Amino acid sequence: MNRLDFVDKPSLRDDIPAFNPGDTINVHVKVIEGAKERLQVFKGVVIRRQGGGIRETFTVRKESYGVGVERTFPVHSPNIDHIEVVTRGDVRRAKLYYLRELRGKKAKIKEKR
């Protein structure tokens, strides 16, 4: 075992479901406003997963009022309350950057059967 793996192991989360690029997910993020804390849901398509171990991140893209919004989250972040997989997508790429250029029905991802 690597020294860094030994240090990182206590911070790794085991409650994260398996998801891949192309999947539509709900990310429940803890938002702190002053003294209050609330959950905010960010629903979108996973366009990439990157890195490994404690440094692993994923990027979720959604359309909000006609504007594309992307947000990158660390997988093992304590600010993520939980993640729900809504649908499984059927894609042939690991990085779905081409979705940035597509609009409307063309940006739709087929669902896995």
Curated annotation (Swiss-Prot):
Gene Ontology biological-process annotations: translation
Keyword Ribonucleoprotein: yes
Keywords: Ribonucleoprotein, Ribosomal protein
One annotated Gene Ontology cellular component of this protein: cytosolic large ribosomal subunit
UniProt keyword Ribosomal protein present: yes
InterPro entries on file: Ribosomal_bL19 (IPR001857), Ribosomal_bL19_CS (IPR018257), Ribosomal_bL19_sf (IPR038657), Translation_prot_SH3-like_sf (IPR008991)
Entry-linked Pfam families: Ribosomal_L19 (PF01245)
Gene Ontology MF terms in the entry: structural constituent of ribosome
SUPFAM superfamilies xrefs: Translation proteins SH3-like domain
Stored HAMAP family: Ribosomal_bL19
Role noted for this protein: This protein is located at the 30S-50S ribosomal subunit interface and may play a role in the structure and function of the aminoacyl-tRNA binding site.
PANTHER family (alphabetical): LARGE RIBOSOMAL SUBUNIT PROTEIN BL19M, RIBOSOMAL PROTEIN L19
Family label: Belongs to the bacterial ribosomal protein bL19 family.
Protein name per Swiss-Prot or TrEMBL: Large ribosomal subunit protein bL19
Gene that encodes the chain: rplS
